[in-house]
Each structure stands twice: as structure tokens, then as C-alpha cells.
């Protein structure tokens, strides 16, 4: 499926001033917090995962990959790899409670046309959708410190492999696609000194 190109975020030469500066400030704060971590949707077993990065302006980019090297054919003796490189933008988050914000996907773009195929070096590459984000109608952001026992069990089921025994609060931010019941857990963002320092502090505590 093809995605529509998103409308430009700003107009050239025009300063766009929001009437609701409080909402903008809170939105920026949420995205700034989300941007401290990278996010993973994976089962903990198998070769598939979706990696996601959120930026301070609410935009995001990521990739999904899965490998089935046992599925071969005459033209692809080395198996099949499913891929999706994508980018997009979240809408302005709406506060639900102290640790939860609700949002939607405002736009989504794919690097390659979904369902397209290429064969390279004996491997068939099939371009798929963004597993974990596809079909999303409502997405929840969970802030660091959120009580785990108050989160949806469907979300906790996905993130449980990343939790320590006895852990009662999230030590990172998380993302939950309610529609597809897909949960992303947070991790140290590569190149982020702030999140690295935070992770080191948590290890010491």
C-alpha cells in the first residue's frame, strides 16, 4: 500500500505561531522525553524486530526486518528477508494521566513500495509494512516511571523480556499500538549522552 505524502510542516518564509502555547509546550516536552530513547518491538525469540526512533518535533523513523533463510527457491537459494524502512510523524499528544499520553500517526511514508520485491545475492527481499505500527488508530506513550501494574497486560506481555525481576516502574519510555496490541520498549539511544548517563545511574542504584 502506498502512503500519501505528508503536508509540509511549515510554510517557507512564514512564522507559524500557535494560539495554544501551553499545549505546544507540553507536546514539545513529551516528544523531548520520548526522544531520549530508542524503541524496539520484538518477541525476544526469532529473527524479527521493528526499531523506532522518535524526534523532538514528533517525527519518527525506523525499520522492520525478518528473515526466513529456510524458505528458498530457484532464484533465491539463500532465503527470504522481509524489510521495511519508514518515517512519519505523530500528532500532538493528548494527556491521559500523569504517565500516559495518547496520539495518532499523522503521516507515514515508506522507502520502498510495500509488497515490492528484489533478489540480491541469492536472497529475496520483500518490502512489507511497518510491523507494530501498521493499522494503528490509537497509540499510547508511557513515560518513564509509569507503574507497570497499571499498564495494559497486552503491552506488558510484549515488554516483559526487557524487565528485571521485581521491577515495578518503567525505567524508560514506551510505545503501545492499542489497535494491534503491539508494545515497544525503550532502550539507550545510540549517541545520546543524556540517556547513557541515565542508564549508568540506574545501574549504580
What positions do the PLM features span?
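Sec-dependent signal peptide cleavage junction
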Residues: 1-12
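Tryptophan-anchored aromatic micro-motifs
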Residues: 20-51, 61, 176-190, 194, ...
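Short, solvent-exposed secondary-structure boundary motifs
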Residues: 37-46, 79-83, 130-131
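Hydrophobic beta-strand residues in large extracellular and virion-surface proteins
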Residues: 37-39, 52-54, 60, 90, ...
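N-terminal glycine/threonine-rich, aromatic-flanked beta-hairpin/loop signature
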Residues: 46-116
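Beta-strand-rich cores of mature extracytoplasmic or soluble domains
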Residues: 109-204
Amino acid at each position: 500500500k502506498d502512503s500519501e505524502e505528508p503536508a509540509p510542516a511549515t510554510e517557507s518564509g512564514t512564522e507559524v505561531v500557535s494560539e495554544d502555547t501551553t499545549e505546544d509546550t507540553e507536546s514539545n516536552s513529551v516528544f523531548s522525553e520520548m526522544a531520549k530513547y530508542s524503541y524496539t518491538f520484538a518477541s525476544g525469540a526469532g529473527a524479527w524486530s521493528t526499531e523506532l526512533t522518535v524526534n523532538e518535533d514528533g517525527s519518527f523513523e525506523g525499520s522492520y526486518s525478518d528473515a526466513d533463510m529456510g524458505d528458498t527457491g530457484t532464484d533465491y537459494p539463500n532465503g527470504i528477508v522481509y524489510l521495511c524502512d519508514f518515517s512519519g510523524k505523530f500528532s500532538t499528544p493528548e494527556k491521559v494521566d500523569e504517565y500516559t499520553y495518547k496520539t495518532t500517526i499523522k503521516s507515514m511514508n515508506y522507502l520502498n513500495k510495500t509488497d515490492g520485491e528484489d533478489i540480491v545475492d541469492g536472497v529475496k527481499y520483500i518490502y512489507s509494512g511497518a510491523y507494530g505500527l501498521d493499522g494503528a488508530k490509537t497509540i499510547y506513550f508511557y513515560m518513564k516511571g509509569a507503574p507497570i501494574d497499571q499498564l495494559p497486560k497486552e503491552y506488558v506481555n510484549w515488554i516483559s523480556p526487557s524487565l528485571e525481576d521485581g521491577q515495578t516502574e518503567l525505567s524508560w519510555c514506551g510505545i503501545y499500538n492499542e489497535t494491534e496490541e503491539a508494545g515497544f520498549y525503550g532502550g539507550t539511544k545510540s549517541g545520546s549522552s543524556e540517556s547513557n548517563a541515565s542508564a549508568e545511574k540506574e545501574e549504580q542504584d
